[in-house]
Design a protein with these regions (language model features):
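Bacterial N-terminal signal peptides that target proteins for export
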Residues: 1-8
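Short amphipathic beta-strand and strand-loop transition segments with alternating hydrophobic
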Residues: 65-69, 147-154, 207-209
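N-terminal signal peptide c-region/cleavage motif recognized by signal peptidases
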Residues: 14-16
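Preference for bulky hydrophobic residues occupying beta-strand positions
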Residues: 47-49, 65, 79, 146, ...
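N-terminal mature ectodomain segment of secretory-pathway/periplasmic proteins
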Residues: 21-110
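Short, solvent-exposed mixed-charge patches
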Residues: 259-260
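Gly/Pro-enriched, hydrophobic low-complexity segments
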Residues: 82, 93-95, 103-107, 113-117, ...
Length: 260
């Protein structure tokens, strides 16, 4: 009897999965990816940002990153620019949310003032890079609707789920995004971004994943290519440290001008 019940349960589960719609599967995959990264608390890292124009000329920026996990809301993040000298001291603070607009502030030392980034401007480029302001907030599940597309091989011999996500928040610069998520660890491998007209705008590729604190995966490099301008931005990450003791006081917009 017990074996028969187990077989029935397995059959019901299989039927449930098979009956799953493309939208339900896409949402489930996004939720699982989010759940696997929950509980990191906080982390700090160093980042090198390399900007390349169409001719291949480069400019390099050195940035320190701090991130705080927030229960029941999006993460808080702080970017502090150390180089080059002409932008040293620039800082960007982000409070990410679900469907509510992210709160973002930019401190510009040359002007000695903190500038709030308006919701309508989140699709603009961050500090001349190919990353938009909206790319830099934490990617809360609620920000998008999802649709599973297919399975296919992806980078480094991995197998990926491919899904489409459509921004559910106002003023996004994207009509949709197509995401490749690896089936081993639910890590993003590639994202294609489509502009408001539906044209292919950019591609972001993650590579060199490392595991930290026994379960948290972070990419060593993130390469964003703009197919419409020929420009690109490479982010190179290093010196990750988790659970360093950061708290809300380390993410205060009123202290941006005093940060070092």
């Amino acid at each position: 009897m017990k074996q028969w019940l187990l077989l029935c349960a397995a059959a019901l589960l299989s039927t449930s999965v098979l009956a799953e719609t493309a939208e339900e599967k896409g949402l489930r995959l996004a939720q699982e990816a989010d759940a696997r990264d929950a509980g990191f608390g906080d982390h700090v890292a160093d980042m090198q940002m390399i900007l390349r124009n169409r001719a291949g000329d480069e400019s390099v920026r050195q940035i320190r990153i701090r991130v705080l996990e927030v229960q029941g809301d999006g993460d808080k993040s702080l970017s502090l620019f150390d180089e080059p000298a002409d932008i040293k001291g620039t800082a960007m603070l982000t409070y990410s949310h679900g469907l509510e607009p992210d709160d973002q502030w930019l401190y510009l030392p040359a002007l000695k003032r903190v500038k709030r980034i308006a919701s309508r401007n989140k699709s603009g480029p961050f500090m001349g890079s190919e990353f938009a302001y909206e790319d830099l907030g934490s990617q809360e599940v609620e920000k998008y609707s999802y649709r599973y597309l297919r399975d296919e091989p992806c980078a480094d011999g991995l197998q990926c789920w491919v899904m489409e996500r459509t921004p559910a928040y106002e003023y996004s610069g994207y009509s949709r995004q197509v995401v490749w998520l690896d089936q081993a660890e639910y890590r993003p491998i590639k994202t294609d971004f489509y502009d408001r007209k539906g044209d292919h705008l950019k591609t972001l590729v993650w590579s060199g994943y490392q595991e930290y604190a026994g379960r948290y995966w972070r990419a060593d490099e993130m390469f964003m290519e703009n197919h419409q301008t020929g420009k690109s931005t490479l982010l190179k990450w290093s010196n990750y440290r988790f659970k360093t003791g950061l708290d809300d006081g380390d993410f205060n917009k009123n202290a941006l001008a005093r940060l070092r």
